Amino acid sequence: VDIKGKAILFESGIYAKIPDDMPEKLALSALDVAGAPAQTAKLCQYGQNVVIIGAGGKSGMLCCYEAKKRVGVTGKVIGLTNSQRSTQRIKDLGFCDVVESIGGMTPVQVNELVSNLTGGKMADVTINCVNVPDQEMTAVLCTKDDGVVYFFSMATSFTKAALGAEGIGSDVNMIIGNGYTKGHAEFTLQELRECEELRKIFTGLYA
């Protein structure tokens, strides 16, 4: 619903200006998930193995792009998808070193897949972007001890994540879905300016 009006914000309230160099719907589609790529930039380091669950979705594509920038040529970005369409989409973008469809796979099967792809090292960072329930154990099992799991998905159950990790003796650090980090709005809009392929896909899907 489009309106003309005024918003009264608390002093601590966050807001972002719509930029002049892109359509409003395109900007809003990116701002909706702006925290994910900005947090990815903080979490990922050169040479790491990074697993992104839901890599072909809106937040997943942005995270894959940022993760590859951060891990460089010696790191590895593994994109995990659920549908044929999202699998092909992220493959075409070329941000991931490996793309695998895990639709119908159990967490243990995904663990074995990631183990094979990383030579047994597992992921330093796992980012869950898929907005469906019961992905907690998949993310935990992909990640090495002392690694980081970032649950960006709002479908995450804290109970399942915490008790599941404890139950299998996994010493991972878990970040639960904080979609805000300083400068996240401009950071994410800049990704669309930097990457023409990403901007084209976002325009076609969301704008």
Regions found by a protein language model. Name each.
Residues 120, 189-207:
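C-terminal capping/lid region of NAD(P)-dependent oxidoreductase domains
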Residues 68-134:
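Adenosine-nucleotide cofactor-binding segment
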Residues 1-49:
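NAD(P)H dinucleotide-binding glycine-rich loop of Rossmann-like/cofactor-binding domains
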Residues 130-195:
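Glycine-rich phosphate-binding loop and adjacent beta-alpha segment
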Residues 40-46, 118-120, 141:
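Glycine-rich helix-loop-beta junction characteristic of Rossmann-like nucleotide cofactor-binding loops
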Residues 34, 54-61, 65:
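Glycine-rich NAD(P) Rossmann-fold beta1-alpha1 loop
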